[in-house]
Amino acid sequence: MPVEVSTIDRKWYRIIRKPKATSQEIVLFALRELKVDRYNPIVSVVLAHDALLLELNHKYRNINKPTNVLSFNYEALSHNCCLGEIFLSIDRLTYESKTLGVEVHAHFTHMLIHGVLHILGYDHEVPEDAQEMQALEIDLLSKRSIENPYLIQE
């Protein structure tokens, strides 16, 4: 089950120890826990910065500001599928961590799990879907000894 990781911004190496291996481990953990690892999907993770996420957010969502995570689903879940691509911004991640008073690694893990759920088809556009997605995030994060991020934001 390949998880391909590209590190576009070198700042990731100062913030996350072994960003490639850490990203792979978190994605594989989420896929295992969600019981979709048996499909052996390919997932791509791009560790980027605000400039790239601003460009992608504007191009694909018509939103002219950077964001913390963007996910693109490429294929429906099937054996050996190219499931999707997850982009993370180091700038948003570090800013939000400081603002929320959350450890960077915990926020990184949360955003990566959030991205995995998006490429699996979960969304948070309507309240019922948001509750389902948040419940999954909270459960997965708790299994990694990370507290509920939605309590912190209140």
UniProtKB/Swiss-Prot annotation:
Its main location: cytoplasm. GO terms for molecular function: metalloendopeptidase activity; RNA endonuclease activity; zinc ion binding. GO terms for biological process: rRNA processing. The keyword Thylakoid does not apply. It is found in: Cytoplasm. Coiled coil: none annotated. Its cofactor is Zn(2+). Keywords: Cytoplasm, Endonuclease, Hydrolase, Metal-binding, Nuclease, Ribosome biogenesis, rRNA processing, Zinc. InterPro entries: MetalPrtase_cat_dom_sf_prd, YbeY, YbeY_CS. Binds 1 zinc ion. PROSITE patterns: UPF0054 (PS01306). Zn(2+) binds at H114, H118, H124. Its EC number is 3.1.-.-. One of its GO terms (cellular component) is cytoplasm. NCBIfam families: rRNA maturation RNase YbeY. Single strand-specific metallo-endoribonuclease involved in late-stage 70S ribosome quality control and in maturation of the 3' terminus of the 16S rRNA. Belongs to the endoribonuclease YbeY family. This is Endoribonuclease YbeY. It comes from Anaplasma phagocytophilum (strain HZ).
